[in-house]
Amino acid sequence: MDRLSGIASDQDVRRVASGPSVHTQARRTRVAKLYFRYGAMNSGKSTGLLQTAYNYEERSQRVLLIKAVVDTKGEDSVVSRLGVSRRVDLLVDADDDLRALVRRRALAGAQPVCEAGGAQREAVSLREVLDCVLIDEAQFLTALQVDQLMEIALIDDVPVLAYGIRTDFRTVSFPGSRRLLEIAHSLEELKTICRCGRKAIFNARKVGESFVFDGDQVAIDSGEVTYESLCGKCYLAAGGRLSGQ
């Protein structure tokens, strides 16, 4: 795997990931943004997130990994379909204030900040102790929590990279994805292919070997419930309906 594949698509993110340490003055010139990297299931979102975390940490920069409690796959870990996994730093509920949680976690027990001349002081701002926030399955966040991620980027000056899918198995958008599409500075589609070879854009739910198009919006793939990424043509052929009609 290309060691830069997790961040190569956005030049400004690449500059952050390859730039100076959190303790250097040059870091303060960075302009932080909220990024949304989305795609159908099996498009490599979790793999990309884990690669991005590795790229930052290889440069001695600090990251914070987040996922929603409702995502029970892997329990407290981000798990890619390649078998790579990593424990997250924060599991969040729908009523959690993400900015407050991130600040509390990152600043708690942070190492003293080195000033010019060798003097040390206690860290008081998030950007002094954190280089990037990474969110897996960001579609499970609330719209308010996405706004809080934007505040981390704009107010705390820390880049936020959110990975997730746009729509559920009925082609209805998730609240978190909808808000990310509305306000994120940068949108990047991660592509995968349908069984027919076309680009997959929908996530079809299966129970056993049969496609289903009714049920709760959230059903984590495990046991009998699985998902298949389909193009629009194959989605309709399988019995799917375009819910906007």
Regions found by a protein language model. Name each.
Residues 140-141:
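Residues immediately C-terminal
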Residues 153-176:
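Sensor-1/coupling segment of RecA-like P-loop NTPase cores
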Residues 184:
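Short basic (Lys/Arg) and small-residue
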Residues 137:
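Walker B catalytic acidic pair
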Residues 26-113, 117, 168-179, 189-192, ...:
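Conserved P-loop
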Residues 133-134:
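Walker B beta-strand of ABC/ABC-like P-loop ATPase nucleotide-binding domains
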Residues 193-220:
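Short recognition patches in nucleic-acid-associated and regulatory proteins
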Residues 52, 144-152, 176:
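A short acidic, amphipathic alpha-helical/loop segment
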